[in-house]
Amino acid sequence: MTSVPIFESVSRFLPPANEDEQYWWKITGQHMARMMHEAGYPEDRQVECLLFHRFKVIPCLGPRPRSDTPWYKSRVGGGAADGCPINYSWRFGTADRKPHIRNFIEPLGALTNTPADPLNEVATKALLQDYSMTLPNVDLEAFWTFAPHYRPRIIEKADIEKLAGASLLVGAEMSPDSHTIDIKAYMYPRVPSQTSQLLTTILPQAMRDAYGENVCLDSLNFVHEFMTKDPQGSQLVLTGTTGIDCCKLQDTRVKIYVITRNTSFDHIAAIMTLGGRRPISEELLGQLKALWYELKGAPAELPSSEQLPVQTKPDGSKNPIVVPFYFDIQPRLALPDVKAYIDVSTSPVSDLAAANAVVRHLEQHGSGQNPKAYLNVLKDITPVEELETQKGVLAFYSVAVKKNELDITSYFNPQVYKRYFAHEVHLNGQRRSVFE
């Protein structure tokens, strides 16, 4: 991990911090600086976002690691993650748009992992409230209205212990040509019965409470009908995860996350097109199929009606493949937007091979500005030999269709715990160079 000059300049004039915050700043602050530098952010925007990260994100990451085992295993980053409470995303740009950088955190506080806060929601709500007072564009009206509908009514002690875990996450998007930080909140129902009631009871009532009794629910109702009556849509399973934009109510989107275990490309295409109701050109479907097969390590000649080959873990057990999607619900739209997620953490393809495949796709189709800058970021976070031989940096690639091209985002992990010993050597070396 090599330092970026602007990170050094900002660090030089920061006030003293405690040991935990110093650690997280030296690791994740440098990651953020590298991403913005490679993405071509203006220098003033880099400084602005680094200061936001230092004072509004770092204090929420909790105690610094003391071993390669997390004291609290966060759900940020999905199955690829090592329990670290932060991960990143890089939304590849287009010919006329620079990449967009985001981070996702599960805020950790004094009550995290204690009986006083079994759902780890206190620190998150405090952080969101702080954002609403310091970021002019943040509006929590929709979130405060939705959140009570997702909070479980748990009474029995045994249920509390069984269902304890993360219930909220926060995302922060830092666009290069803006002076705002866009905030998103993600809610996770802990009780299974809540998930089954999401489309029929919880979301309709939450949307009426937020937007008024006469709110148009066409888009939400379409998702429910698609998942109950369509031959392809009925194979989808709700995860319960729901994302919501923390902005003015009229601009707020609600994202509903689902999964499928059908891995045939014909099925993937049917979900992306909503059973043909949202057409996608054959050219774009062909691009998506080629990328899907390459990232999943499937042979190019595999028929589109066939399931992906089942992967076998080192211990001989089978590695089930699931495909996540989200539906983007907006009251003013009759149909939802759709985004697919390609999980590369369980793919036989190495992290470096997956990243190279995406960069190749972007270069072949003239998408993105200097997509190889993304490779520079990955190689700075993790040595090339680890990217070639190990898994864990890359979590997902998401793919949507925007303006007749594939809109691709990479989600990846800092590996703070997995690379704990390497970070210790790096930081101790830094400390010696400062005090010698």
Swiss-Prot record:
Molecular function as annotated in GO: prenyltransferase activity
EC number: 2.5.1.-
BP GO terms, sorted: alkaloid metabolic process
Keyword terms of this UniProt record: Transferase
UniProt entry tagged with the keyword Transferase: yes
Pathway: Secondary metabolite biosynthesis
Listed InterPro entries: Aro_prenylTrfase, Aro_prenylTrfase_DMATS
Domain of life: Eukaryota
Chain's role: Prenyltransferase; part of the gene cluster that mediates the biosynthesis of neosartoricin B, a prenylated anthracenone that probably exhibits T-cell antiproliferative activity, suggestive of a physiological role as an immunosuppressive agent. The non-reducing polyketide synthase nscA probably synthesizes and cyclizes the decaketide backbone. The hydrolase nscB then mediates the product release through hydrolysis followed by spontaneous decarboxylation. The prenyltransferase nscD catalyzes the addition of the dimethylallyl group to the aromatic C5.
Protein family membership: Belongs to the tryptophan dimethylallyltransferase family.
Name of the protein: Prenyltransferase nscD
Gene from which this protein is expressed: nscD
